[in-house]
Amino acid sequence: MSETMQSLDQLAALKTTVTGADAPTYTKKVDKFGRAYATGKRKDAVARVWIKPGAGKITVNSREVETYFARPVLRMMIQQPLVAAARAGQYDVICTVAGGGLSGQAGAVRHGISKALTNFEPELRSVLKKGGFLTRDSRVVERKKYGKAKARRSFQFSKR
């Protein structure tokens, strides 16, 4: 028993504390125009996003978000990081997005907005990280294999 107590005391003596200097610090990254920039990715889509303080106007490829993303679900996806951070209507978002389909593009814009928000306000990082907005969704289309009709579907099999 005394041996275990002695070894516990030895372990306690070896304990080191992590100081604030070791922990990563995030700083505000804003350009000379007062905008924060980030890139977001989802499937084959890549979005370049700039945010600046404003009235909450979102522009995608020089078009209003309502005309570019006609489906309400896609518009809701784009708004999620702003709503989670309680910053809806406080930032203007300008983004260019290329590649993929509409769903992938909306996901890329959402990822880009989240990263740009953390560049503008680093204290929002924990809220957005908890919501899963800063994590890149790595799921992509599985490649087609030879000897198969698609990635997994086999050709029709005839017994006779």
UniProtKB/Swiss-Prot annotation:
HAMAP family: Ribosomal_uS9_B. Belongs to the universal ribosomal protein uS9 family. GO terms for biological process: translation. Keywords: Ribonucleoprotein, Ribosomal protein. It comes from the Bacteria. GO terms for molecular function: RNA binding; structural constituent of ribosome. The keyword Transcription does not apply. Gene3D superfamilies: 3.30.230.10. This is Small ribosomal subunit protein uS9. It holds the Pfam family Ribosomal_S9. It comes from Rhodopseudomonas palustris (strain ATCC BAA-98 / CGA009). The initiator methionine may be removed. One of its GO terms (cellular component) is cytosolic small ribosomal subunit. The keyword Ribonucleoprotein applies. SUPFAM superfamilies: Ribosomal protein S5 domain 2-like.
